[in-house]
């Protein structure tokens, strides 16, 4: 971001099993552990390098019911979402909004988008976004049905799992929304 580094290794990991409570009938089974790593370089290192077109981040901790939305207590209750409905509403609002912002800023439209990868909180959010954007389900990549919500790793992991199938020229949007109401998006040109 400051122009000093030419190479970086970006890591993300979440050990959600430290938080979840299997006896919780509403959420105990929804979480998964995962990690992902990406090597980013200013110079090309292979013929199949993808380009990060743009990145956008935003903190929305002041919005809605953010301060009370999610509680992480490893040894005392696990992950609790007393304001889960508000998290759902804000995620369904800001994930597509962030992608549309980046597309427009960089001279693209939804028609240019090859794949959409959203934070893997639940499939209801992805279905809601697909309807809002009028995008076919085939453009949405996901792994939540096999891994659960892997937290901050979820979108990066979906990208990594599908990297082999991206073709030269594909435009991939990745967008996230966390329980702390941190949100963002990234456009990648393959």
Which residues make up each language-model segment?
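Phosphate/ATP-binding catalytic cores across multiple sugar-kinase/actin-like superfamilies
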Residues: 94-105, 128, 132, 158
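Acidic, glycine-rich active-site loops and adjacent beta-strand->loop/helix elements
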Residues: 12-17, 58-60, 146, 176-181
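Claisen-condensing/thiolase-fold acyl-transfer catalytic domains that form or cleave C-C bonds
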Residues: 1-4, 114-190
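Acidic-glycine-rich active-site phosphate/pyrophosphate-binding loop
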Residues: 5-16, 67-72, 125-137
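Flexible, glycine-rich active-site loops centered on histidine and acidic residues
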Residues: 3-34
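Phosphate/pyrophosphate-binding loops at sites that engage ATP/ADP/AMP, CoA/4′-phosphopantetheine
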Residues: 97-114, 162-166
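Condensing-enzyme catalytic core mediating Claisen C-C bond formation in acyl metabolism
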Residues: 22-93, 97, 177, 190
């Amino acid at each position: 971001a400051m122009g000093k580094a030419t190479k970086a290794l970006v890591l993300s990991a979440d050990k959600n099993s430290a938080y979840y409570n299997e006896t919780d009938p509403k959420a105990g089974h929804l979480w998964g552990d995962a990690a992902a790593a990406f090597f980013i370089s200013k110079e090309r290192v292979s013929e199949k390098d993808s380009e990060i077109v743009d990145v956008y981040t935003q903190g929305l901790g002041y919005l809605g019911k953010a301060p009370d939305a999610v509680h992480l207590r490893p040894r005392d209750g696990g992950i609790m979402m007393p304001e889960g409905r508000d998290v759902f509403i804000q995620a369904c609002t800001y994930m597509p909004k962030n992608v549309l912002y980046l597309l427009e800023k960089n001279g693209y439209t939804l028609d240019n988008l090859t794949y959409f990868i959203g934070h893997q909180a639940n499939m209801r959010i992805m279905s809601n976004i697909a309807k809002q954007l009028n995008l076919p389900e085939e453009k949405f990549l996901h792994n939540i049905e096999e891994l659960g919500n892997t937290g901050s790793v979820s979108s990066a992991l979906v990208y990594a799992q599908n990297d082999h199938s991206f073709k030269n020229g594909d435009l991939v949007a990745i967008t996230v929304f966390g329980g702390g109401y941190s949100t963002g998006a990234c456009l990648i040109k393959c």
